[in-house]
Each structure stands twice: as structure tokens, then as C-alpha cells.
């Protein structure tokens, strides 16, 4: 155990001395010259500005993942309409949804009908008692 502690102390002391030797070569006026505008221009070359613009740009729409999962970048509305026409015939397709009295959201299944929701809440309360 004492050998491990001695090795750890030796390692820490040697890294501290090595870091001091490297730090001695630095310019002491580095921080005092920081506000010089010419040096700032040298520090921020064109590729760095280009990198910042690339980071700040908005991602493409196909890169977003919504709650329903990844969108297929190759699919388009025309392809989906053609598929629906093939499945349901060439008649007019109704785009209305069939609404029910409940929906499933992030918080679980919820009732749209307030009476049904209150009834289910009371049933859950009675079961817990």
C-alpha cells in the first residue's frame, strides 16, 4: 500500500515539474496583448468563421426526428397518394380522420369526452381504495 502511495506522489510531482518546464517557455505578455485588434484578427482566420457559420446553420428538414419517428427522405406526398389510390382504387380519397373519444399522447391514453374521463377517473379511484 505504501508503495502505491509513493508511486502516486512521485507521478504527481513529476507531472507538476514537467508542466512548469513547458509553462516557462510561454510569453509573459500574452494576456496584456489580448485586446490588440490585429491579434484578434490573426486568432480568428476565415476557416474558423466558416466553421461557426456551419454550426449556426439550420439543419435540413429530413434531419429532424419527430415523435412519430424518422421521416423517409425519399418519400413524397405524390408517392403516398399513389399508394393510397392503389390500395383503395381510383376513387376520391377522403382525408378525414376517424375521431374517437380518446387519444394516446405522451402522457398516455386520455379521453376527449369529459364524462367518460370522469367516469374512468372515478373507477380508478375506487379500485385504489
Curated annotation (Swiss-Prot):
Secretion signal, residue range per the UniProt entry: 1-19
Site (Cleavage): 59-60, 63-67
GO MF entry, a single one: substance P receptor binding
Compartments where located: Secreted
A biological-process GO annotation: response to lipopolysaccharide
Cellular component GO terms, alphabetical: axon; extracellular region; extracellular space; neuronal cell body; neuronal dense core vesicle; synapse
Key word Signal present: yes
Prosegment location in residue numbers: 20-56
Main location, first listed in the record: secreted
Family affiliation: Belongs to the tachykinin family.
Known function: Tachykinins are active peptides which excite neurons, evoke behavioral responses, are potent vasodilators and secretagogues, and contract (directly or indirectly) many smooth muscles.
Descriptive protein name: Protachykinin-1
Organism (species): Homo sapiens
Phylogenetic placement of the source organism: Eukaryota, Metazoa, Chordata, Craniata, Vertebrata
Gene: TAC1
Amino acid at each position: 500500500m505504501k508503495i502505491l502511495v509513493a508511486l502516486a506522489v512521485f507521478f504527481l510531482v513529476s507531472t507538476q515539474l514537467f508542466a512548469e518546464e513547458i509553462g516557462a517557455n510561454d510569453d509573459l505578455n500574452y494576456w496584456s496583448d489580448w485586446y490588440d485588434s490585429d491579434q484578434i484578427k490573426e486568432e480568428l482566420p476565415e476557416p474558423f468563421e466558416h466553421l461557426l457559420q456551419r454550426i449556426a446553420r439550420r439543419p435540413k428538414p429530413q434531419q429532424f426526428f419527430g415523435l412519430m419517428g424518422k421521416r423517409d427522405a425519399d418519400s413524397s406526398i405524390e408517392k403516398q397518394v399513389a399508394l393510397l389510390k392503389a390500395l383503395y382504387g381510383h376513387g376520391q380519397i377522403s382525408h378525414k380522420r376517424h375521431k374517437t373519444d380518446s387519444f394516446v399522447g405522451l402522457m398516455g391514453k386520455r379521453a376527449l369526452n369529459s364524462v367518460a374521463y370522469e367516469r374512468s377517473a372515478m373507477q380508478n379511484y375506487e379500485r385504489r381504495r
